[in-house]
Every structure is written in C-alpha cells, then in structure tokens.
Amino acid sequence: DCAAGAALIAQRCPDLRSRFIIQIYHPEEYDQVADLGFEHIILTVYQMSWSEKQDTAALVRFAAEHPLEGITFPVELADTPGYVEALLEAQVPLFVHTVNDPADQAALVRQGISGIYTDLGAPAPQE
C-alpha cells in the first residue's frame, strides 16, 4: 500500500521527505501522501481501470488541482491517438513504461514524453 509505505518513511526519516518522489496509483491516495509531508508525487495509472486510464480529461483536471512531478502510463497508451497530446495539456512531465528499444524511446521523446522507464542501463555509445 502506497500510503503505508509513505507513512513508514515519514515516521523513520522525517527529515528526508523532500528527497523522495512518491508514486501513487490512484488519485485518492494523493491527499494521504501529501498530508504526510511529501511534496514530490507522481501519479501512475498502472493500477487504474482501463476506462480511468483513458479518461484524459479527468487526469488533466486532477493534475491542475494537485501539484504533480508527472504522470506515468504504459507505452500502449502512447500509441492511442490523441492520448499524449491530451495529457500534455496537464503541463506536467509525462513518463511511459516499459520501453527498451532506443528507436522507440526516441520516437516517444519526439511525441513529448519526458522520461522512459526501461529495463536497460545507459544506452550504448553510438559509433
């Protein structure tokens, strides 16, 4: 549970809260985490229902009402026409998971994606 993990961090390391970026899985977790003193929060749609993930208007509205470090979503949604463009209206960084192919990563960055979760380390140097 996200809030329980955040509570444990807040209890054991209260002076380090500003160094953590807490990833919440549902909008209703935001206030619980923020009330513990965490200022850096990412909303990931990973555990939301498919219809909630696709409701870009609700996600943009949520981001307008709650300071976020970003919104994270599966790469499949980036392929949905208009999805990335709609979320860019939130004016927060967008992150996708999981993309390992460098060409796919570059294409996502061109779409406006700010960061990419990957299973790989740093890209190999180009010769």
Language-model features: where?
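Short loop-to-alpha-helix "cap/lid" segments that border enzyme active sites
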Residues: 1-127
